[in-house]
Structure formats: C-alpha cells, structure tokens
C-alpha cells in the first residue's frame, strides 16, 4: 500500500478508477497479488498503477510525465529529463514526422536522508510530545485507503468507479468476500524475518543523489 500512499500524496486522488485485481493468482492466498489499474484525474491527467508479488527481481518505479519533461524515481535516485520547450508546443510546430523535442537529463541531488519507518515513528512521537509536524496526517491515510477501496470495488463490479466511492456498495461487496472466505486446513509454520524491511536508509554518497542501505 505504500506506493498508493505516495501516488495520491504527490498527484492527488483520481476521479475515476478502472482496476483489475487478481486474488491468489500466484500464491495460495485470498487477497490480490496481481493488480493493474487505470486512473483519471480531475485535471485530465491519466495514470497507470501496476503491482504484483510474482515479479523477480521486481520493479519499483514512479514516473510523472510533464509538458516540459519527465520525473523518474527509481533505484533510490530521482532523475529529471528536462525538455527545452513544451512538448505541446513542439507537437504542433515540428515539421518532421519523427522528431522529438531536445532536452537533457538531470540527476536531482538528494539530502541523503531516507528514515522511512523510523522517521515516521519519530515524527509521530514528536507530534505528541512537542507538537512537531507529522510526516503525513490521518487525512492522507484515509485518502490512500479510498484509492485502494476504489480499485477493489472496480474489480469486484467489473466497472469503472468514481471517487468518492459508494461506501454502502463497497461494504456489501466486501461482506460477500468475507462470507466466501475459507479457513486453510493445511498450515506450515515458518519463521519470517522482517528486519530488512523495517528501518531507515541513509546515504553515504549524497553528491550523486544515491541512497545506500
């Protein structure tokens, strides 16, 4: 869910969602493990969200295409490909059939700080003890949940849904899935180490914008 939080935090909530959520497609589970969603935003922008738990080595990429360039966050780096003129202006003035607007790539320098869970918890404690600002308040959590619920509802009904969603219909469909849930009869106990997924990342190479664990 973290990438959904980032998506709506940075881009805002979409107004329409069409999603395809596959439950137990790759694992013996009753929740989604393969999702593709198409998003439409109030300003006319569109987006695509794709995720799966069966992709190795996996992709963690956040891309925003703008009129004057493109932002890409991937491999702990933020890159901006800056165009010399607006793509919209170039589109209607270029005379060649396959020309592209000129531009150059810029690696955005980061501060090297990426505290992740530790930073969120420290900010939460600081807000209680000293009134310090949170990384994100409860409203952001509700918005991320709204987007997740919209994707589920779209997939369950096989329709495009508008936001805010019909909460009564969502609860109805959720309860249908609850009733259809089955208890696993064969369970294998395992020890699952989550230490590598919890903590913070601090760069020792801030001049290049890189972040190392």
Where are these regions (language model features)?
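Residues at helix-coil transition
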Residues: 12, 126-130, 156
